[in-house]
Amino acid sequence: DMDGGALSKRFGPLYVWLVTLTVMSGGIAMGLASSMVNVAVPSVTGAFGVGLDQAQWMATGFLATMSVSMLVSSWLIEVLGQRITFIAILTIFGVGSFMSAVAPNIDILIAGRILQGAANGVGQPLAMFTMFSVFPPEKRGMAIGIQGLVSVLAPTFGPIVGGIAIDSISWRYLFFLPLPFCVPAMMMGLVFMPTKKLARRLPPFDWIGLAMVLIIVFSAFSAISNGPRTGWDADSVVYRLWGSAAGLVIFILWELRAPYPLLDLSL
């Protein structure tokens, strides 16, 4: 059980930069995965003989799951601590990458992308929380800048790196490309990430609210991704949009009465 203070004494002034390198390595892996798949859509549709509407779920499933998993990140950090959460999400991310790379069909590939998205959604708040916890107050602006740089540059280079991989080898290897950053991040995380004693009792969490958000987000993302192809007046698109709107109203009503709301609307 070593928190940031104990680890800082152990590793000295370099500790904040060791933590920065750790979370940046994980951030680069996840940032690349968030955008590089866009250039693989034509290859995937040809490989599996599916339409664009199915292939788009590689991106839609990733983004939707990432959006929802962000909401559970603070609870996970509180329960597991930074180190275990970091190792867990990188493991999930690695499993998702491997599933996508060796997928025998589009469904397994999308499932792998959903795992990647879930890990990414927790990873972004975790990285910022960790850097804030180890940087002194007067240097937290620098921490924000470093994190912002990774958040912008990694997704920017994703399509470039992905395109080179597809042209040179195969679209399947595209999903292995983040792993050279992921594996060192896990190894460094085992040493440098702060840890804590596991809570004996789980803190309360609004799981019903989270399930509602999951349904709302997937319905909305599905409608938005299919609208340009099928037409915004298509029944499937209209039903999903109305469903997500109705779900949003129900979610707001629930949050106003929930004992431990996911979003405190009274603020």
Residue ranges and their predicted role:
Residues 1-31, 46:
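Cytosolic juxtamembrane N-terminal segment immediately preceding the first transmembrane helix
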Residues 17-24, 36, 40, 94, ...:
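The feature captures the transmembrane alpha-helix scaffold of multi-pass secondary transporters
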Residues 31, 38, 63, 67-74, ...:
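Conserved kink/hinge residues within transmembrane alpha-helices of Major Facilitator Superfamily
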Residues 33-51, 76, 131:
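Membrane-interface helix caps of multi-pass secondary transporters
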Residues 167-267:
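Hydrophobic transmembrane-helix bundles of small-molecule transporters
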